A protein has these predicted regions:
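A generic structural motif
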Residues: 13-15, 25, 44, 545, ...
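Juxtacatalytic substrate-recognition/specificity segment
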Residues: 789
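Accessory, non-ATPase domains that flank or precede helicase/AAA+ motor cores in DNA-metabolism machines
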Residues: 1-457, 469-485, 768, 795, ...
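Inter-lobe coupling/hinge segments of SF2-like helicase ATPases
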Residues: 290-296, 300-304, 313-755, 767, ...
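A C-terminal functional module that forms or caps the active site or interfaces directly
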Residues: 776
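Long hydrophobic segments that form regular secondary structure
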Residues: 759-764
Length: 835
């Protein structure tokens, strides 16, 4: 019998696949897209089958695959094609690409079933007495048992019945039985839901001072008063929300103990039951979902043009540019509705994990609370949760996927629409191999699957808006806020003048302090943005001027007061806070700069009665922490929310009337040609969080550089003015969208090797410099040492991306010939940062 082969992509830093032989007993299960366990050198690795070649090289010794891990292919043919495109475009190892595309390897339970076919039925019915002439006894026994069991048997029962796998395979090859695999459902996690009992509630509430056998002694005195106050707050919450709520949310929003709620249940004041938890659902959802608005003229026109694109039945990219609060989400939801009505599926990408919960909630509110067709995919899910969601999508149990960057690989079939919300965000760019941009991959996937790609933003990237103005993308514009609500008033606080007046370098100006006080007096909410984590940026010595540096990176360490230690935000290195300067032993060390932790502390000092929380990576390390804080703020349990840039993206806080930006200068000072763009985008986005409800909003931007055009245009929320000024700068300096960029970094823990290899690569680049491409470097990277590795950087510019691709492919081949390890060379195509 001829041997069967398969090409397997392995997660190793090599730009090739590996050929393996398929054992006879596994041939029925091996097909493109399945994960397999294979021997590789002296160990076993998990890989994905990408194709089945007819023959293999006769020179090489072909080893056999060891095991098929998923009998149902994890990747569709379209995703395999997309993976090869990513590997080619981003010059990434193909195995690393497919590793990024796949869900976590978890032991999902499957069941193998044996089903008799119509041909098998016909054979048994027509020749019951002569089967023995052609079939073995165990084959006849299997066919008879299938007939007796209505045509279906679990494969696990065959061995007990004395039927061999050989007999099963022989019947399957003759078309008399089929072998099918299905996923076994796991028991779902549940959560407690509580609601207020309305019948005779007042009578029961008054009697709660009586004995409750389930809870022990009756309450008296202050304990009774405290319980009655807690009962009142719970009742007000549940009645004002007009519906049941998850117990964790009730505990958070009204700040009551679990034991108090249990006593209310025992007193029959509350009714509770268990409901399954869907990973797509936010258990801290405060129940708010904006109602469907009557569409304004701009929204009508945008939807009309989206429908027209659907009617054409062909690929296209549309850029939905709308001011903050203009109703882009409603356009998204109606576009998804149109897609589902056409029996197709939809994919929604969002830049932050927290926004997956919010967008999933919008879908549920729009399509109905019991709509089970929404799946979520993001890194905060556990491996098991992610795998379950992935297979829900793969098995067509979910028709809408909401997720962050990696959700672009969701195995949806019949894909009709891909939405990329806040398409300009850097978080769509992967920082590790493979260094793909989720937005650009989404566009390519839409093209491959003949779907529509809808990019949305209030501050589009210069590249996307340039494509829209030149006709490559179709521009859809939402020019006004929903219900004609006014944009927030944006004011600049000049910190130079503030210092001259107060002679203090406080992070909270007098104007911001007064604005927060006014918010508290009115009972509305305030957001305070500080785009730095920690307590202080660095620890400096007043004697010698040295800062405390990370042992692994060329970067100052950040002081975190709540943990009383220094941390590197790049490699995670931790050190004790020094009492003396590590360099000169001076005792005159001080903390320089303020981060979100210090600003939170200042606000607590200024407003001791205010309810304040902080939202950054330090306070939201788990999915639950995200949900608790956002749920509490949205539900009105907090007055002030301090946070980093994650606050600026997409959230719809109805009661926020003030946004304060502690410093607009941090991003502007970065050594990056996109610094102005990032500053304008962040300021405009965060300004859009104010005044989204019925109350008017106000934004205060603190800066030492109020004259900069990025700040001036953000002040007016004038994207078109900023686009024109920044485009002129990019055209003059030869930056995107007028050229394509690539960065090559040579790295090693040994400085001499890093220098030698970068020189060898420079020798390859030198003859090409000036011939359709400009090559700068090698030079020490802005972060010259990172995670113990020394880094040298080349910057390549060309009007034609194909020139860069060809040149860089040659450079990688040159590295291979000169024995420069693959792991020592990073290629970043279309970088979003030059750091």
């Amino acid at each position: 019998m001829n041997r069967t082969f398969c090409n397997v992509a392995l997660a190793v830093p090599l730009r090739t696949t590996f050929t393996y032989a398929v054992p006879e007993q596994l041939r029925a299960a091996v097909q493109p897209g399945v994960r397999v366990l294979v021997p590789f050198r002296q160990k076993s690795l998990v890989g994905v089958v990408v194709d089945l070649p007819e023959r293999a090289s006769e020179k090489a010794k072909i080893r056999e695959i060891s095991k098929v891990l998923n009998v149902i292919p994890a990747l569709t043919p379209g995703l395999i094609e997309l993976g090869h495109w990513i590997a080619g475009y981003y010059l990434a190892p193909v195995g690393e690409v497919f590793r990024a595309m796949l869900p976590p390897v978890t032991e999902l339970r499957t069941q193998q079933q044996i089903i008799i076919t119509a041909a098998g039925h016909q054979l048994v019915d027509s020749r019951p007495r002569t089967l023995g002439e052609e079939f073995a006894a165990e084959e006849i026994a299997l066919l008879s048992k299938l007939i007796a069991k209505n045509g279906i048997l679990p494969a696990s029962t065959l061995e007990k019945s004395g039927v061999s796998s050989w007999a099963l395979q022989r019947l399957a090859r003759r078309g008399l039985v089929e072998i099918q695999h299905s996923l076994l459902a796991r028991k779902q996690k549940t959560q407690t839901i509580v609601t207020w009992r309305t019948e005779d509630s007042e009578k029961r509430e008054k009697s709660t001072n009586g004995s409750v056998e389930k809870r022990g002694r009756p309450l008296q005195g202050k304990a009774l008063e405290r319980f009655q106050e807690q009962t009142r707050r719970v009742r007000e919450l549940l009645e004002s929300r007009r519906g049941p709520l998850p117990l964790p949310q009730v505990l958070k929003l009204v700040e009551v103990s679990r034991s108090a709620v249990e006593r209310m249940l025992a007193c029959d004041l509350l009714y509770s039951w268990e409901e399954p938890i869907d990973p797509a659902e936010d258990p801290f959802d405060v129940g708010y979902a904006p109602p469907a608005h009557e569409l304004n003229a701009d929204q009508h026109m945008a939807l009309k043009r989206i429908r027209a694109r659907f009617e054409l039945g062909e690929f296209g990219v549309q850029l939905l540019y709308g001011v903050t609060g203009s109703g882009k989400t409603e356009v998204y939801l109606r576009a998804i509705q149109e897609t589902l009505a056409r029996q197709k599926t939809a994919l929604v990408l969002v830049p932050e994990i927290a926004l997956t919960l919010w967008m999933g909630r919008q879908c549920r509110a729009w399509f109905g609370a019991r709509f089970e067709g929404v799946a979520v995919l993001h890194s905060a899910l556990s491996d098991v949760e992610r795998a379950r969601e992935w297979w829900r999508v793969r098995n067509a149990d979910a028709r809408v996927v909401v997720g962050t960057r990696s959700a672009v690989f969701a195995p949806l079939e019949r894909l009709g629409l891909i939405i990329v919300d806040e398409e300009q965000e850097n978080s769509y760019k992967q920082e590790e191999t493979p260094r793909y941009n989720g937005r650009d991959v989404a566009i390519v996937r839409a093209k491959m699957e003949n779907a529509v790609a809808l990019l949305g933003s209030a501050t589009p990237s210069l590249e996307s808006y340039h494509h829209a103005t030149t006709g490559k993308y179709e521009l859809l514009t939402l020019g006004s806020r929903v219900e004609n609500r006014a944009l927030a008033n944006v004011e600049v606080v000049d910190l130079r003048e503030e210092f001259q007046q107060t002679h203090q370098a406080s992070s909270i100006s007098a104007k911001l302090r007064a604005g927060i006080q006014e918010c508290l007096a009115r009972g509305t909410q305030a957001l305070v943005l500080i785009n730095r984590r920690g307590y202080s940026w660095s620890v400096l010595c007043r004697s010698c001027g040295a800062s405390v540096q990370c042992a692994n990176c060329s970067i100052s360490m950040t002081y975190h007061k709540n943990r009383n230690r220094l941390e590197c935000h790049y490699c995670g290195f931790v050190a004790q806070t020094p009492k003396n300067c590590p360099k000169c032993d001076s005792k005159y060390v001080y903390f320089f700069g303020e981060g979100s932790e210090r600003v939170e502390e200042r606000l607590r000092e200024e407003f001791p009665t205010a309810r304040i929380a902080r939202l950054d990576r330090d306070t939201t390390r788990t999915k639950r922490q995200y949900q608790e804080t956002l749920g509490a703020f949205t539900g009105g349990a907090l007055d002030i929310l301090v946070g980093t840039q994650m606050l600026a993206k997409g959230h719809d806080f109805q009661r926020v009337t003030l946004v304060g930006v502690i410093s607009a200068d941090g991003l502007l000072s970065m050594p990056d040609f996109r610094a102005s763009e990032h500053t304008f985008q962040l300021l405009t986005q965060v300004a859009g969080r104010a005044g989204r409800g019925e109350l008017h909003g106000r934004v205060l931007i603190q800066t030492y550089y109020p004259e900069h055009y990025a700040i001036q245009d953000a002040l007016k929320q004038d994207y078109l003015s900023f686009f024109e000024r920044e485009t002129n700068f990019r055209r003059t300096m030869g930056y995107p969208p007028f050229t394509s960029l690539a960065i090559v970094i040579v790295r090693n823990t040994n400085l001499e090797k890093a220098i030698r290899w970068s020189r060898q690569l420079s020798e390859y680049f030198s003859p090409h410099n000036g011939k359709g491409v400009r090559i700068l470097g090698p030079a020490a990277a802005p972060l010259a040492r990172l995670k113990k590795e020394y880094r040298f950087q080349f910057l390549l510019k060309s009007p034609k991306r194909s020139v860069l691709t060809k040149l860089l492919a040659g450079a990688l081949h040159h590295c291979e010939k000169n024995e420069i390890p693959d792991t020592a060379v990073i290629v970043d195509m279309d970088p979003l940062s030059l750091m």
